[in-house]
Amino acid sequence: MQALERDIDINRLEKISIGLASADEIREWSRGEVTKPETINYRTLRPEKDGLFDERIFGPTKDWECYCGKYKRIRFKGIICERCGVEVTRARVRRDRMGHIELAAPVAHVWFVKGVPSRMGYLLDISPKDLDRVLYFASSIVTWVDREGRANDIDRLRQQVEEEIRQIEQDRDEEITAAQALLTKRISVIKGESSPDELTEDYADVPEEEREEAIARARREAEETIEDIKRSMDEQIELIRRAWEEFQTLEPRQIVDDEELFREMKDRFGDEYGYGVYFRGGMGAEAIRDLIRQVDLEKEARELRQVVGESRGQKRQKAIKRLKVVDAFRTSGNKPEWMILDAIPVLPPDLRPMVQLDGGRFATSDLNDLYRRVINRNNRLKRLLDLGAPDVIVNNEKRMLQEAVDALFDNGRRGRAVTGAGNRPLKSLSDMLKGKQGRFRQNLLGKRVDYSGRSVIVVGPQLEMHQCGLPRLMAVELFKPFVMKVLVDRALAPNIRSAKQMVERLRPEVWDVLEDVIKEHPVLLNRAPTLHRLGIQAFEPVLVEGKAIQIHPLVCAAFNADFDGDQMAVHVPLSPEAQAEARILMLSTQNILKPADGFPVAVPSQDMVLGLYYITYAGEDFEEREPKALLASYAEADNAYREGSLRLHDKVILRREGERIETTLGRVLFNESIERTLRGYLGDAYNPAAYRFVNHELKKGEIKQLVQQYVERYPTELVSQLLDTLKHVGFHTATLAGISIGKNDIVVPEQKREILEKYEKLVEEVEEQWEAGFISDEERAERVIGLWTQAKNEVEEAMKANLWKLNPIYMMANSGARGSYSQITQLAGMRGLMTNAKGEIIDEPVKSNFMEGLTVLEYFTSTHGARKGQADTALRTADSGYLTRRLVDVAQDVVIREEDCGTDGYIELPLYLEDGQGDPNDSVAARYLARDLVNPETGEVVAEAGTDITRPLFEAWLEELPRETKVPVRTPTKCENPHGVCQKCYGRSLATNRPVDVGEAVGIIAAQSIGEPGTQLTMRTFHTGGVSGVEDITAGLPRVVELFEARHPKGEAVISDIDGIVSLEETDSERLVRVVVTAPDGSEAREYRVERQLLRPEIVDGAEIRANTPITEGSLYPHQILENDLRYGRGTTATERYLVDEVQKVYRAQGVDIHDKHIEIIVRQMLRKVLVEEPGDTRFLPEQVADRFSVLAENERVEEEGGRPAEFHTILMGITKASLATESFLSAASFQETARVLTDAAIEGKVDNLTGLKENVIIGKLIPAATGLPKYRRLTVTVEGYRADDVDELDIAAS
């Protein structure tokens, strides 16, 4: 324990192991035994001696002061007061000094008893139910039997037993004879024939008339007495016989439920005062510990391996499970008897505090109550043992002690939870670790930090891209130590203390110093929820008045921020390293691209788009119009605009670089602003001829492309300046144009009435056909819905044609600034069809629009969909967050580890998506070619293997290669690096558009890229409108979860398990058809009965199909694809591609772009594990799930030594299971099922090598990624004007 009190350099920790603690270790950790349940004295409010807060055990409550006050001040450091026995030291030792409780009887650790499966039960091969009965004193268990002694002495024992039975029978007969003799005597006394004695005096002097009755009574009593004698003696004989029978077949670990029988056996055959000690047994943890101590782990493991090798079915499964536990104990160095505790540790008091509330009452941690229960029961048990109380009472107290310790370790695991005030279950040690409020997630993975603040955000349109506005009051508080240091350095304050006072009083000098301090000192801004890495970015602060943080309009998209009351947090990077990181890696100008797809995220939106659209707008009749002026330069254009001789949309001809450009004045002014920025940054290097004059309307999409071109062509710094220019021009123009909305801008088309009347007639005709019985109700609904959809489209077209092109509402929608045509249609056209609560379309549309107003019925019809939408959004947010958490957990340790793993594996991606739209497959870009790329038509090599596929190169291929080209590329799923991914398999970093750096945490980025758009996905299951047979097809978020968890899909398709030829056969039922697939060589055939209407069109008689070909419509089951492919030796590629493509389908349906490689990283983690079928000579167990790379490494080792390697096959795991199966127990425990993970890890004596990010965050070490890697940590940073002997701001902050 003393070692724990020394400060450990966390960053030098290499690994952490976990194991079982022996009683001796628990006593070693302890500073003293807690023997009293008292906490603090209610009068003095000081800890009680020997109690749960005792200062002698846990250390002083005040720094450098003993309990009695004899020693005060630091100069007495380390002295132990001879009066009160308290060591003079810091009070913070009360956070790590432990105590212990010596138990009067051993108790079992509830995790190992009641965990599922029961580890103790597996070790002893006792069912959990029986184990429970023994531990809680309901049954007895035999711990040892002297089989040899019993066999040798069996005849003697039989004789002794028979002799005893004979003796009892003889005694019985004698007692019966005596009873009969007494009866005879009583009768003669009643009759007056003899004189009475003591036994017969009640029957003397009976009157004549009552003698008959008295004789009858005497006879009755005699019969009862004889009956009692017979019964008690027979019971005794029966018990002895049963005990003898039981004893003859008694075996160790046998449970005896009958307490009387066990006592009888023990008295006779288990006691030296009986017939001798032939067996031992008992109840409670003591008996179980005796059994555990007898287990020979080596022998048990050998026997179990033999059973596994020889048997099948249930027996083998059980043996495998037992072997896992036995082997864990055998190899870990943990002794199994340590699962039974003789002493329990007491947590340091500051981790279970007791604080006084205002009203003089106390609030205390639940643990104190639980410890008190243990101590009370333990003390009572000690007293009972000292008094020599009967077994029944002692056993009851032992049971209560066991229950108290159970409640302390894991309340509620067995039986009813112990409750406190208000029937609330008390929080036990396990609860302290579990869940969102537990130690792992609340205090280790996420902490509150100093030097941070939060405030409401407002827009700062005057800011530059890399700046943010920080309120003065916030800044002075955040940079306090820095300001104090400079005040002292400049001799504005004599010492740190007075500098602190100056800052607190906000003296005028402070503001000047603050300006200098924050110059070039970036701060981090964060908006919750931080869904991807762009949710935290660095900015240079600019001091602003007021109390709101100002942020640049272009970073809003990355933060998903708006100004309706959002708040953001500010954090100050303190050390020079942290500042350098913030400036170089996290500055907002470095985060223009979105890591999910590599496209710009800092793109002008809303007002800026409107302004840019307006300034580049030319009008429909641009071609026909005559130019109003010929301009020789940008300067002329400026003058003409200022004078008012030309307007923004006037057509002009500009002479530029020797060419005449027909354009508008607005476009000339726009291009001038851009060129001015370029010239200002590039200076003499600027080549105007290379600049492409923008001569088209700028809508949202075009602006995005423009930014994309800037990113590809110019350095980051210039890109941010160009973005600022776009922002300025956009806001400026939008303001000057004065675009706003008025009621009269919503123009209802005159043709609307005619269109509606036309369609009402058509609908009427359909209704008549239905009434006449020509069509079914489903057909009617389908046709009516089709007609009304057409009607809405026609009204929309009429409305578009009707709107003036400079109508503000039209411009907003057309430019992509805000809103959409569908919204304008609802305002000015018709709302159209609505859905009901089930998600089905109501066939009566809303014919009105919002301008005209809805009827009551129409309004009612609209409410269903609107409310469902609201509920949906709320559910979706929670589900999406949980999905992100699971994704992060499964991929958190995937880091770029090396340059090239040298794998031959690759995949072929089509140049265009095969989704019917025929869009380019963006996921080909940002990778490396794995083989030469050959033009399939000409056969020429277009690019060589190893080529870095940049965006421009990919776009060039789209133009020159035929559509059906397949591109062979490297992929993370085929990477052979055992601990992460290599640069070549990953490709380019989408966030920086450069080859990815070694150390980049690509797993986290992948998880964020998939999780962040999760909230945009729908929740709904699509209903097929009553078509029978086809199950509801899941879409949206539930479908993504279904795929990543590798579950059976809803609406699963029937697939062929083998390669073969199809033959279709009729069945008795009209609905069903029999599909038989026969292998080409006729060796096997598979039969599937499927619904006729679900049969896929390509499944026809004689068709040749491969395994995994779907026979019916629906989604495939990924496990089945993998199983079939492995049977044919086809590897995992088909499974990987199915998962990636299906996830992509969901995201593309919502218009979300994600690069395939992110999904591939997650899929790689799902397929990392293998199932060991036959362990050979390796250290693995049969049917053990292990990491593929560790099995391969072990096989290599065994083969070198000439042994047999393990046989295994890949398995697919859902992300939750894969996270729990990770090598790191810290990571798994902080994810889910904390108690189970820690139980298993402790038994196995697991070692956490701290390779992932999570486990390092938990122990407070720098993460082994990016700048946390050793090669980056050895860099030294020199700062100008920073002297080595300066007092550091960090020292000031610490003091």
Swiss-Prot record:
InterPro entries per record? DNA-dir_RpoC_beta_prime, DNA-dir_RpoC_beta_prime_bact, RNA_pol_asu, RNA_pol_N, RNA_pol_Rpb1_1, RNA_pol_Rpb1_3, RNA_pol_Rpb1_3_sf, RNA_pol_Rpb1_4
User: Which Pfam families does the UniProt entry name for this protein?
Assistant: RNA_pol_Rpb1_1, RNA_pol_Rpb1_2, RNA_pol_Rpb1_3, RNA_pol_Rpb1_4, RNA_pol_Rpb1_5
A molecular function (GO) term: magnesium ion binding
Q: Which EC number(s) are documented for this chain?
A: 2.7.7.6
Query: Which reactions does this protein catalyse?
Result: RNA(n) + a ribonucleoside 5'-triphosphate = RNA(n+1) + diphosphate
Q: Which positions in this protein are listed as binding Zn(2+) 2?
A: 901, 975, 982, 985
Tell me the subunit arrangement.
Answer: The RNAP catalytic core consists of 2 alpha, 1 beta, 1 beta' and 1 omega subunit. When a sigma factor is associated with the core the holoenzyme is formed, which can initiate transcription.
Instruction: State the family named in the UniProt similarity comment for this chain.
Output: Belongs to the RNA polymerase beta' chain family.
**GO biological-process terms attached to the record:** DNA-templated transcription
Entry function: DNA-dependent RNA polymerase catalyzes the transcription of DNA into RNA using the four ribonucleoside triphosphates as substrates.
Q: Which UniProt keywords apply?
A: DNA-directed RNA polymerase, Magnesium, Metal-binding, Nucleotidyltransferase, Transcription, Transferase, Zinc
Q: List ligand-binding residues for Mg(2+).
A: 562, 564, 566
From which domain of life does this come? Bacteria
Q: Which residues bind Zn(2+) 1?
A: 66, 68, 81, 84
Organism of origin: Rubrobacter xylanophilus (strain DSM 9941 / JCM 11954 / NBRC 16129 / PRD-1)
Listed name of the protein: DNA-directed RNA polymerase subunit beta'
Q: What does this protein need as cofactor?
A: Mg(2+); Zn(2+)
Query: Which cellular component terms (GO) are annotated to the entry?
Result: DNA-directed RNA polymerase complex
Q: How is the cofactor bound?
A: Binds 1 Mg(2+) ion per subunit.
Q: Does the keyword Heme apply?
A: no
Q: Does the keyword Glycoprotein apply?
A: no
